[in-house]
UniProtKB/Swiss-Prot annotation:
Similarity annotation: Belongs to the tumor necrosis factor family.
Role description: Cytokine that acts as a ligand to CD40/TNFRSF5. Costimulates T-cell proliferation and cytokine production. Its cross-linking on T-cells generates a costimulatory signal which enhances the production of IL4 and IL10 in conjunction with the TCR/CD3 ligation and CD28 costimulation. Induces the activation of NF-kappa-B. Induces the activation of kinases MAPK8 and PAK2 in T-cells. Mediates B-cell proliferation in the absence of co-stimulus as well as IgE production in the presence of IL4. Involved in immunoglobulin class switching.
Species per Swiss-Prot/TrEMBL record: Sus scrofa
Domain (THD): residue spans on this chain: 122-261
Post-translational modification: The soluble form derives from the membrane form by proteolytic processing.
UniProt name for this protein: CD40 ligand
Gene responsible for this protein: CD40LG
Record's bilayer topology term: Single-pass type II membrane protein
Superkingdom of source: Eukaryota
Disulfide links within the chain: 178-218
Alphabetized GO MF terms: CD40 receptor binding; cytokine activity; protein serine/threonine kinase activator activity; tumor necrosis factor receptor binding
GO cellular component, one term: plasma membrane
Pfam families the record matches: TNF (PF00229)
GO biological process, one term: positive regulation of canonical NF-kappaB signal transduction
Location of the protein in the cell: Cell membrane; Cell surface
Length: 261
């Protein structure tokens, strides 16, 4: 007996979506995106258009209001006296409000200008300190007859006055010295007012000299320096002398200061 076997047929593979469906979905997506962009642009245009229409309507109302005022002034009969009085009252209130607003702005501007002019007064005055008889840069006492009007000027290292605000300053110094040396054989006593810039460079602003006295006991002599200079923030000024051992440090003899103009 012969048995026969039949080969089972292979399963069919499921086919993917047809090409037409893919094209349809692609076109639908493009259409939706285009519609969204178009809707956004149209909304922006509509918003701007409505704003423009609103402005035009306001201008038209203002024009009608002005024409009505002119008609009331000319006394045309189409408007009653009551309406004209009401319109005049509205116009007067409008003008009064504008004038008050201008007056307030003017006062605020004047106050700001006045406030800007009221910069803090910057001033300093210090007297000498006999802590060093050898340093050519004079030392100034941090206490006693000592004035610093604000923290915008400081005494740094006891030697120099430093400013923190740019401006025009009057700077002065008085140096009193005592000398009884032979005047013929000695160089004059020289005092210099010097500037140190924020970058660290130094230069002489003012310089004065006086000859020695041969009188005994020694005669007190004073050198006065003073001038107007523009200082930058971080700049400092100091006093230099040729012979610090001859400087007199009594009260009021030797002093140094500045004032912002």
């Amino acid at each position: 007996m012969i048995e026969t076997y039949s080969q089972p047929s292979p399963r069919s593979v499921a086919a993917g979506p047809p090409v037409s469906m893919k094209i349809f979905m692609y076109l639908l997506t493009v259409f939706l995106i285009t519609q969204m962009i178009g809707s956004a642009l149209f909304a922006a245009y509509l918003h701007r258009r409505l704003d423009k229409i609103e402005d035009e309507r306001n201008l038209h109302e203002d024009f009608v209001f002005i024409k009505t005022i002119q008609r009331c002034k000319q006394g045309e009969g189409s408007l009653s006296l009551l309406n004209c009085e009401e319109i005049r009252s509205q116009f007067e209130d409008l003008v009064k409000g504008i004038m008050q607003s201008k007056e307030v702005k003017k006062k605020e501007k004047s106050f700001e200008m006045h406030k800007g002019d009221q910069d803090p007064q910057i001033a300093a005055h210090v007297i000498s300190e006999a802590s060093s008889k050898t340093a050519s840069v004079l030392q100034w006492a941090p206490k006693g007859y000592y004035t610093l009007s604000t923290n915008l000027v400081t005494l740094e290292n006891g030697r120099q006055l430093a400013v923190k605000r740019q401006g025009i300053y009057y700077i002065y110094a008085q140096v009193t010295f005592c000398s009884n040396r032979d005047a013929a054989g000695q160089a004059p006593f020289i005092a210099s007012l010097c500037l140190r810039s924020p970058s660290g460079s130094e230069r002489i602003l003012l310089r004065a000299a006086n000859t020695h006295s041969s009188s005994k006991p020694c005669g007190q002599q004073s050198i006065h320096l003073g001038g107007v200079f523009e200082l930058q923030p971080g700049a400092s000024v100091f006093v230099n002398v040729t012979d610090p051992s001859q400087v007199s440090h009594g009260t009021g003899f030797t002093s140094f200061g500045l004032l912002k103009l």
